Amino acid sequence: MDPINQRIGDMLARIRATRPLIHHITNLVVMNDTANVTLHVGGLPVMAHDAEEVAEMVAHAGALVLNVGTLSPDWIESMLIAGRRANELQTPVVLDPVGAGATQLRTRTNLELLRSLRIAVVRGNGGEIGALSGEGGEVKGVESVSGPEDPLTAARRLAQTYHTVVALTGARDIITDGERVLTVNNGHIWLTTLTGTGCMATTMVAAFAAVERDYLLAAAGGLAMFGLAAELAAEKAHGPASFKVALFDQIYNLTPEQVANGARVVEGGS
């Protein structure tokens, strides 16, 4: 078995054994779904947003998710407080820059988080990563209309600028720390028929980052498992609604051995 695949399977086994708490400061649209995905992969979710409690809550967490999908000034303050405390504790922070490039507020907030905090992984679509990297990309609402001309260059530039891992997700997922590159080829087109699947993917990345300090591999592991679950779910589904149910079932039922055998992760950008 490929060593990367074996490590991905081992990560899932550690998640299931340790049940890390994943602290989300996330958007109102996906809160219930990402909480359930956290449970199904093997972690424990908490959605704590108030500035008075986030520093205390994140002290118990294995990872922190910052998702800017439904922004407000109070939530931005909470993200910065929680992120700084997570950095003090060396707890990984995973950023989902929902809609970056669509409005000045979203772009400005994401850049502030990247400059103010030590972000372990940025997980975004082509439009979002293109906008934040300066390589170009168009976002309509929160959906990517067009990505950068060279997605790998955009991901590398963002990773190098902010000393982070960037996971650019799409038909294939490109993951880089600015030097190393992994490509995940798992996934299914039906993921585009549901709201919040990108946010669910971010939650999967955070769960893997909670047990693996090589965040490049952690991001690949979370995305490979999520994509594999989608592939298997599509075999049982008849449309978006049944696909969502099957997706959650597959995330819950997949074993470390199945994930290790089914992950399609290659080194390099192709």
From Swiss-Prot:
Q: Which biological pathway?
A: Cofactor biosynthesis; thiamine diphosphate biosynthesis; 4-methyl-5-(2-phosphoethyl)-thiazole from 5-(2-hydroxyethyl)-4-methylthiazole: step 1/1
The UniProt catalytic activity note for this protein reads: 5-(2-hydroxyethyl)-4-methylthiazole + ATP = 4-methyl-5-(2-phosphooxyethyl)-thiazole + ADP + H(+)
Cofactor(s) for this UniProt protein: Mg(2+)
Q: Which one of the record's GO molecular function terms can you name?
A: ATP binding
Mind telling me which SUPFAM superfamilies this protein's record contains? Answer: Ribokinase-like (SSF53613)
Give an example GO biological process. thiamine biosynthetic process
Which class of enzymes does this protein belong to? transferase
Q: Which CDD domains does the annotation name?
A: THZ_kinase (cd01170)
Q: Which residues bind substrate?
A: 47, 196
Q: Please name the InterPro entries in this protein's record.
A: Hyethyz_kinase (IPR000417), Ribokinase-like (IPR029056)
Enzyme Commission number(s) of this protein: 2.7.1.50
The keyword Ribonucleoprotein appears for this protein: no
User: What's the superkingdom here?
Assistant: Bacteria
Task: Name the positions where ATP binds.
Answer: 123, 169
Pfam families according to UniProt: HK (PF02110)
Keyword terms, alphabetized: ATP-binding, Kinase, Magnesium, Metal-binding, Nucleotide-binding, Thiamine biosynthesis, Transferase
**Keyword flag rRNA-binding:** no
**So what family is this one in?**
Belongs to the Thz kinase family.
The role this protein plays is: Catalyzes the phosphorylation of the hydroxyl group of 4-methyl-5-beta-hydroxyethylthiazole (THZ).
Protein name (database record): Hydroxyethylthiazole kinase
What is the species of this protein? Answer: Roseiflexus sp. (strain RS-1)
